[in-house]
């Protein structure tokens, strides 16, 4: 199929080099007409305002607009676009919802932005196999709305309502990661258009398998292990190509469909909040809860600055203090056991104001506030942008790094707060910065680099879920080493020899 599509594109424009790319912002007329021939004239734009909208995300990186924006309607058109750009040496930048935090959509070398939001179909739901196939325009909220009456749900939930293929591209995570894992644990297969237009199914066409295996355990089991797999799906067939493309940030190909692992909706759910006298006490409680093998589904930390911002933005009435938001899934009996054990642990660490949220509306209000923490922080300093760090460390080192980071933040003179998915060792400093103030921006970046190196020194990572993007490339080299980076470069060179896929990111 991909070969036929590529041949069709070449027949439309049979001579190589018909359009040598001009300076950034200037694709020649023939090339723009070629784009229109693939997707239709109404699905191509070179308007400055449209290009600028597609040259920025929610990061502090300055806008780098593409030369043109295209909206393909199906995978065949994506394949033809890739083949066309490959033949002419024009960079391609994938675009989903634009909610990334690392400058992943910035067109640093110009080129064509491929906006995939018009491809928004849920292609196949396999309830018996706990899997679903979605196109790149489907967001996590849209998928879960579609699944509402099926008894299944997809748990990976970053703060923004991101596109699911975009989440796969960045290796995203969320508040449920402590129990259900990240995108790396929940992607079974990917359909990828390679830089030259060929079509790849990373686990084979139509297959709903993954590498690795977890035993089958009933979902209602009280002490339920994270990342349990319902239905034995495993494969040892060759290299794990799915794992290669998850987290590749659009640098190896365009993800045009993903097969996701679904989970049974829990029988019962209870959320809880509790406040602490100090950051140390809150984070210590997190470690103790996990070490006690309480199968918490969510455990989120908000420092007192973030708690105050969330109270104001989301109209909560929580105590302004370091706080944990928790959620438990299971049978009614299991929940009672989990809540009792958790309350004992947090009280030993000085917790107060322990409250339960059993009703769905009350829980939704609580977790909506948590998901809106980024916007709550931005609202405290209007006109500024946010910079979010993203380190992740082994759970045993979490109290050390969070407490030290809080002390550094207080001493820095910067405006910021701490929030995070502490159940898996991942937390964020959300720093507010005037992007036009070079001195302040420099201090923010220095703070972030120092924190990244501290995480590496504690055997952690510089990014748990946001990706490398433009800003963490040096930290990536320090994390994986020279041989690791060179191996990545070699893989990139084989798949994308011209370096056209989302240039300037990761490597």
Curated annotation (Swiss-Prot):
Transit peptide range per the UniProt entry: 1-52
UniProt cross-references to Gene3D superfamilies, sorted A to Z: 3.30.465.10, 3.30.70.2190, 3.30.70.2740, Uridine Diphospho-n-acetylenolpyruvylglucosamine Reductase, domain 2 (3.30.43.10), Vanillyl-alcohol Oxidase, Chain A, domain 4 (1.10.45.10)
Subcellular location: Mitochondrion
Pfam family, one: FAD_binding_4
Location of the FAD-binding PCMH-type domain: 62-265
Biological role stated in the UniProt entry: Involved in D-lactate, but not L-lactate catabolic process.
Disease link: D-lactic aciduria with gout: An autosomal recessive metabolic disorder characterized by D-lactic aciduria in the presence of normal plasma lactic acid.
Keyword set includes Transit peptide: yes
Chain positions found as N6-succinyllysine: 358
Xref: InterPro entries: FAD-bd_oxidored_4_C (IPR004113), FAD-bd_PCMH (IPR016166), FAD-bd_PCMH-like_sf (IPR036318), FAD-bd_PCMH_sub1 (IPR016167), FAD-bd_PCMH_sub2 (IPR016169), FAD-linked_Oxase-like_C (IPR016164), Oxid_FAD_bind_N (IPR006094), Vanillyl_alc_oxidase_C-sub2 (IPR016171)
SUPFAM superfamilies: FAD-binding/transporter-associated domain-like, FAD-linked oxidases, C-terminal domain
Protein name per Swiss-Prot or TrEMBL: Probable D-lactate dehydrogenase, mitochondrial
UniProt EC number: 1.1.2.4
GO CC annotations, alphabetized: mitochondrial inner membrane; mitochondrion
Family per similarity comment: Belongs to the FAD-binding oxidoreductase/transferase type 4 family.
Outcome reported for the amino acid change (mutating residue 374 to C): In DLACD; probable enzymatic loss-of-function; contrary to the wild-type protein, unable to restore basal D-lactate levels when tested in knockout zebrafish model
Cofactor (UniProt): FAD
């Amino acid at each position: 199929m991909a070969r036929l599509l590529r041949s069709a594109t070449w027949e439309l424009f049979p001579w190589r080099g018909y359009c040598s790319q001009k300076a950034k912002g200037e694709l020649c007329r023939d090339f723009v007409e070629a784009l229109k021939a693939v997707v239709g004239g109404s699905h191509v734009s070179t308007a400055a305002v449209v290009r600028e909208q597609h040259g920025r995300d929610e990061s502090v990186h300055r806008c780098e607009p593409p030369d043109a924006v295209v909206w393909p309607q199906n995978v065949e058109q994506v394949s033809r676009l890739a083949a066309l750009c490959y033949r002419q040496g024009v960079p391609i930048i994938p675009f989903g919802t634009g909610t990334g935090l690392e400058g992943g959509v910035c067109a640093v070398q110009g080129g064509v932005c491929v906006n995939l939001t018009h491809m928004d179909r849920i292609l196949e739901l396999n309830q018996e196999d706990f899997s679903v196939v979605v196109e790149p325009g489907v967001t996590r909220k849209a998928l879960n709305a579609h699944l509402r009456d099926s008894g299944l749900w997809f748990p990976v939930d970053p703060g923004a309502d991101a596109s699911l293929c975009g989440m796969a591209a960045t290796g995203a995570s969320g508040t449920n990661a402590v129990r259900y894992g990240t995108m790396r644990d929940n992607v079974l297969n990917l359909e990828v258009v390679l830089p030259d237009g060929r079509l790849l199914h990373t686990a084979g066409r139509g297959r709903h398998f993954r590498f690795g295996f977890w035993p089958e355990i009933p979902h209602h089991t009280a002490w339920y292990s994270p990342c349990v797999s319902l239905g034995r799906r495993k494969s040892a067939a060759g290299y794990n190509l799915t794992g290669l493309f998850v987290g590749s940030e659009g640098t190896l190909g365009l993800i045009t469909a993903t097969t996701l692992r679904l989970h049974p909706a829990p029988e019962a759910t209870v959320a809880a909040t509790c406040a602490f006298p100090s950051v140390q006490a809150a984070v210590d409680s997190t470690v103790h809860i996990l070490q006690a093998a309480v199968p918490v589904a969510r455990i989120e930390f908000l420092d007192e600055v973030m708690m105050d911002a969330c109270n104001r933005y989301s109209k909560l009435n929580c105590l302004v203090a370091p706080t944990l938001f928790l959620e438990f899934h299971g049978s009614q009996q299991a929940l009672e056991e989990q809540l009792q054990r958790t309350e004992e642990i947090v009280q030993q660490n000085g917790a107060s104001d322990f409250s339960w949220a059993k009703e769905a509306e009350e829980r939704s209000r609580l977790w909506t506030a948590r998901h809106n923490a980024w916007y709550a922080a931005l609202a405290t300093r209007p006109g500024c942008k946010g910079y979010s760090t993203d380190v992740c460390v082994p759970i045993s080192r979490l109290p050390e790094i969070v407490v030290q980071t809080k002390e550094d933040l207080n001493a820095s003179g910067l405006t910021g707060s701490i929030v995070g998915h502490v159940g898996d060792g991942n937390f964020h400093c959300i720093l507010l910065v005037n992007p036009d103030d070079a001195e302040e921006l420099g201090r923010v970046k220095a703070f972030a680099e120092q924190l990244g190196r501290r995480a590496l020194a504690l055997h952690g990572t510089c990014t748990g879920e946001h990706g490398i993007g433009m800003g963490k490339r040096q930290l990536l080299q320090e994390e994986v080493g020279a041989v690791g980076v060179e191996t990545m470069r070699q893989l990139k060179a084989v798949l994308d020899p011209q370096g056209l896929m989302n240039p300037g990111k990761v490597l």
